[in-house]
Amino acid sequence: MNNTFLLLGNQLFDPQILKDRGCKRVFMAEDYGLCTYEKHHKLKIYLYLCAMREYKDELQRNGIQVDYFSLDDRLDKKTYIEFFIEFSREQKIDKINIFEIENKFFEKKVLSSLEKAGIEYEISETPMFLFSRKEFGSLYGKNKSFRLGNFYKVGRKKFNILVDGEGNPLGDRWSFDEENRKKIPAKTHIPELPKFNLSKYHDAVASIVEKLFSEHPGNAENVWFPVTRSEALDLLDDFLIQRFENFGAYEDAML
């Protein structure tokens, strides 16, 4: 079994998912193209880079070898896939595992490049979504269009959300859209966001962002979000405990 995986910057999954698939080694590379295909805010680029570096450490703590390349390692401006193919040839890797890539254009480019380079690949189903590609595709049937309202019905039945034992909606309602457009009252208490420690990579990444992406909007000073998986899960817990109860009524409101 081939046990080397190519992981993109948005595929920072629970390491156990990789271990369950026999993963022993991972290739990760920061990519200039990812940071510049749009003129992203500097904090978004900061999140990309810090999260990837923190995830590298998490994989290593789980006994997975990581071949990691920062932007400083890639100043020759090769594309992401060109860089990976060069790495594979140097390491004599002739087969790679990848997860489905949600960007279909980029996925097609990656797969065709691997084929041209003579590198075999095995594709694993992504754990990123609630519906698999096959399952989602089957929802369309012969219809040329598929409305969100129909998708919600399927999802509620699949996950048993507000339905009875026969799959009928509780209260005879499939939609509650008209109830999520309330204005937030002026005296409503909105809990403060939890505080997170800066990443150990903060200084290095903030410096890279300012040096390489100086023309992008914003700055990398006001970091208010987590950059590790564990702290992101903590933030989710905080949302469910502190905010979820009233989220539905005000989800379309702006402050």
Describe each PLM feature range.
Residues 234-255:
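Gly/Thr-rich phosphate-binding loop signature of adenosyl cofactor/nucleotide-binding cores
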Residues 1-71:
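N-terminal beta-strand-loop-alpha-helix module at the start
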Residues 35-42, 67-70, 217-225, 250-255:
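Glycine- and acidic
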Residues 79, 83-225:
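Beta-rich, aromatic/charged-enriched effector core domains that present basic-aromatic interfaces
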Residues 72-78:
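Acidic-and-aromatic substrate-binding clefts and catalytic sites of carbohydrate-active enzymes
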Residues 10, 31, 71-72, 101-103, ...:
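An acidic- and aromatic-residue-enriched active-site/binding cleft used to recognize and process polar
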Residues 47-50, 54, 105, 227, ...:
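Generic recognition of stable, solvent-exposed alpha-helical segments in well-folded globular domains
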Residues 8-16, 80-84, 106-109, 253:
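Short alpha-helical segments and helix-capping/turn motifs at coil-helix boundaries
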